[in-house]
Structure formats: structure tokens, C-alpha cells
A protein has these predicted regions:
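Surface-exposed, interaction-prone regions used to assemble/regulate multi-protein complexes
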Residues: 1-158
Length: 158
């Protein structure tokens, strides 16, 4: 299904704050790791944010193009196991999760590619897993959304 977005920016994730943002689905398709976001916090410095403050977007998409896993572990839920284990994942195509919340995200760039480290937590009531840590390399990122709604929650604390 083709989606159309009003705002589309490439390689601008350093201007998107993802802590506590909810992701309804993470999956691999068309050589992209796709994050279907319920919302994102678009920082004031983002080239497509016309406001002097960070704003929360509505639903949007983050795509990591030509991704390659450097490290990925999936933590089993402590509710389903007395001795929870970490499960390594090695292929991007194995990444298919629903209802995750970003706890940590950082991006770096070198001469060859971008890299990101992220930790996402799952709702233990709906998942066999507690969360996942992903360290991934990719050629570029694309961030898409339609509207900037309210001022971001953290603007009151700056």
C-alpha cells in the first residue's frame, strides 16, 4: 500500500527525538527497515519544522534503507520465563515486531554509512519479549509525517 506524506526528509534523524515514542510496527520490506510510528518528536532544528520549538507529529514512518544488522538481541519476557534469556537475531528480515516504545536511539555517520543503536521496549502483556537492542548500519534514512500537532512535552523542561 502506497502512502503519501506532506513532509519527507532524508538523513534527518538527528533532528527527531524518539524517546518514549510508540511504534505500532517494525518490519522489513523492499530492502528497508520500516518503523510505523504513532508519533515522533520533531526538534526545532529540523529543516522542515517551521516552529521555534519541537513539535509532536501525527503518525509517520521512518525507513532505514539497505539495512545491515551489526548486533541485535531480543530479551525474553520475565513473565514467561523464570530465567529470561537474550536471543540473538542476525538477519534484518527477522525483525517483525508490533507495539514497541523507543527507550533509546542514537545515530552516527562515518564515510561509508550511517549507524544507529536503539533499544525498544515491548508491552509484556502482549509479547513474549521484554525488549530488543538493535545496532544497525544503513545507507540513508527517510522520515515522513503529515502534520506537526502540539508542542513537544519536553519543551516545558528546557
Amino acid at each position: 500500500m502506497e502512502r503519501h506524506y506532506k513532509y519527507i526528509s532524508e538523513n534527518s534523524l538527528k533532528y527527531v527525538f524518539l524517546h518514549d515514542c510508540c511504534c505500532s510496527r517494525i518490519h522489513f520490506a523492499d530492502n528497508k527497515l520500516i518503523f510505523e510510528m504513532d508519533w515522533m518528536e520533531i526538534l526545532a532544528q529540523h529543516p522542515l519544522n517551521p516552529y521555534p520549538q519541537a513539535h509532536q507529529s501525527g503518525p509517520g514512518i521512518i525507513e532505514l534503507v539497505h539495512p545491515r544488522i551489526i548486533e541485535c538481541t531480543l530479551a525474553e519476557s520475565s513473565i514467561t520465563q523464570n530465567n529470561p534469556q537474550s536471543i540473538p537475531l542476525g538477519m534484518v528480515a527477522e525483525l517483525n515486531f508490533c507495539d514497541a516504545e523507543f527507550r533509546y536511539y542514537t545515530e552516527t555517520k562515518n564515510d561509508k554509512c550511517y549507524q544507529a543503536e536503539m533499544y525498544l521496549a515491548f508491552d509484556e502483556r502482549n509479547s513474549l519479549y521484554y525488549g530488543t537492542f538493535i545496532h544497525i548500519a544503513y545507507e540513508k534514512s527517510v522520515v515522513m509525517w503529515n502534520e506537526l500537532n502540539d508542542i513537544s512535552w519536553f519543551e516545558d523542561y528546557i
